[in-house]
Amino acid sequence: IEITPLIEEELVLVQLRPPGLAEEPPPAPLPLAQVSGMPLVIPSRPNAIRMHVEAEMAALGVRPTIALEIDGVSAILDLVADGAGSALLSRHAVGSSVRPSSYSLRKIDPPLRTRVNLAISSQRPATLTQRATLDLIVEVCKRLGL
């Protein structure tokens, strides 16, 4: 398999923004061990982000406090907006939501990073159409700053 890295994103703690809360200066990063004690709205297993969060917390000897399990970023953000708990998502996921200003974002320490890679067979050569599509995907990710 030939693997091409596309995106590396940092996960942040997403919470309902209290009315009038200013984001300047941004709050200090929150220790991951402390995040584990907060009620989280998180995807159900098996989900790459869920598994990554659980593995990183396990390395610290803690487990996440799951408030709700639901799949889909928009559903997770709706539940956070309704006060059901906090979430661990990328800034891009929140920024592309319907109501990005409804949320407060806070960095985690140590940072949680996710990676998206493009995998293709190294034993079967890609067609010209496949190669053009792959090149376009890489170009779009770079252009978007992802």
Question: Which stretches of residues belong to each language-model region?
Answer:
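Hydrophobic hinge/microswitch elements
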Residues: 46-104
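Generic preference for hydrophobic
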Residues: 3, 13-14, 40, 88, ...
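Short beta-strand-centered segments that line the small-molecule binding cleft or hinge
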Residues: 1-16, 23-24, 29, 81-84, ...
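A late-sequence structural motif
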Residues: 20-21, 104-146
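Secondary-structure junction motif
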Residues: 15, 21-24, 29-32, 39-60, ...
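Conserved sugar-transfer catalytic core signal across GT-A, GT-B, and GT-C glycosyltransferases
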Residues: 9, 31, 75, 114
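Short secondary-structure boundary/capping segments
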Residues: 2-5, 31-33, 58, 95, ...
